[in-house]
Amino acid sequence: MCTFARALAVLCVLVLLPAQVAHAQAPVGYRVSFPTPEHRWMQVEVTFADVPAGPLHVHMSRSSPGRYALHEFAKNVFDVQVKDGRGRPLTPARPNLHQWDVTGHDGTVVVSYRVFGDRTDGTYLSVDATHGHLNMPAALMWARGLEPRAARVEFLPPPGKTWHVATQLFPTGSPLVFTAPNLQYLMDSPTEVGMFTLRTFTIDDGKGPAQTFRIALHHDGTDGEADAFAKDVETIVRETLPIFGEFPRYDGGTYTFLSDYLPWASGDGMEHRNSTVLSSSGALRNPAQRSGILGTVAHEFFHGWNMERIRSRGVEPFDFADANMSGELWFGEGFTSYFDTMITHRAGFDSLTDTLDNLAAFVNAVTLSPGRTFRTAEQMSQLAPFVDAAVSIDRTAWGNTFISYYTWGAAIGLGLDLSLRDQTHGTVSLDDYMRLMWTTHGVPGMKAAPGIVAKPYGMEDLQGRLAQLSGDASFAREFFAKYIQGHDVPDYARLFGRMGLVMRKKAAGKGWLGSAPLVTANGGLRVGVVPFESPLYQAGMAQDDQLVTLDGVDVTSSQTVLDVVAKHAPGAALALKFVRRSGETVNTRVTLEEDPRVEIVPAETTGAAVTPEQRSLRAGWLASRRMK
């Protein structure tokens, strides 16, 4: 993120000069209308009043809160018209693709434009005959220097339609008019405009006023399915609460789940200060999709603490004009991924077997990936602008050089949780660590204006809080040096053993050709990304090469490969014939290895005895804490 832009944003919020106070009393006005929503565009008119003399620099955002890459939202803007307060046309200059510089105004600048949107998710804009699904950076222009000003947003439904509005924006006396105290809050306020099903529930955490939770559900299901979903969401909310001990004081006392489950929606979840966007092409009626949908609910709701209020300095304040880089996403995103796994199990949605399989997936992804030798978890986090829904058309080496900070962070969270429980005989856990981060950074950070976090953290804070919690600065220092800023992984087998669980090879003694994907393309079975040092890599195969024969057997499908490998033990050298994408035929041998992937199972299922202490530690880790 641009250092100057961040410093300016902080200065604008914390040091209001007299002229700025005057400007703050002239809110930026937006009128958002949907004349022909079936054509996938909407009309926006924005009025900047009391504009200082000189050029007004109007921008379309390039990035969006909760995302870290550039998305260049100006690409969908068209038919831009600019006038002054008396209606005189003005011709803006275009210093770049996402900026309009307006001169010659009379203190008022009115910009109108159309913006296209046809992607229902947490990042973009979607307009059709059923709704307007707005992510504000993809929808609304803003002006440099006016960021501290309040905003007034009016929504105008399509002619003849009665559309409603669900948003974290502050309500007014009109159901179609809302406000935001500043640009940061406005851009962080996704909005659903249309006909949706609304469910609400209220929970008192005993620490302040009761908080109201709203579910604005746009789906093609029944009211009964909506009721069941609302009940599941409430269960997740109640299961999450004990981890932190209290809810954030949501602005306005309300938190909103903006949920779009539609055949044309894209799978996504996006956190915001007092709301979240949930989208999927899956249907609530489909039991096979329930776990994934509820896992996203748990993940995004947890972000209301971890990322929205416990916030890294790398993304606070958020820079809408550049990519946002943070070295702490292993914590912000990864620990959240670990906890969404734990919450859905504690809440009763995922079985023990499914949960242990999910945890094993974290461990396998990190311990077996060659990427761990090239970068640390901190460095993987810094790569987010390249991989977080970022768009590129050239091939990369990510399959061999990158591990998602979601996955690696979840594995780190797992290791730290079990380590704390091990060292303290179950009296201290990662729940306590999150609660400490909440009380030392989240709660103090809420003293700023809505949309601003006053006490973001850095790496030194994360390590310092671990030292404080554990009472052992050397433990915290070593943990960070080895597992976060180094390339090591915790001793998961020993840690699981303390919980009465066994981590073992899933296919011990079985031959293994590696994890390169096999796909049928261009008339043959071809390999995808070949992991460094895997059997096929050692044999000289690379992406796009075609398998012809293995052990003398014609390869016609991936099942053929599995059948051949299943007949041999690790160490067997099989004849291999393949054709490089250049057309060269290669005859060689490939040596099978033992499948290194692990699984995690209860010790009692292996015939081993489980001690009372192990059972107690396991129960303390996995049992529900749900507030009734």
Model-assigned labels for residue ranges:
Residues A7-A19:
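Bacterial N-terminal signal peptides
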Residues M42-A74, A138-P158:
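Surface-exposed beta-strand/loop patches in extracellular or lumenal glycoproteins
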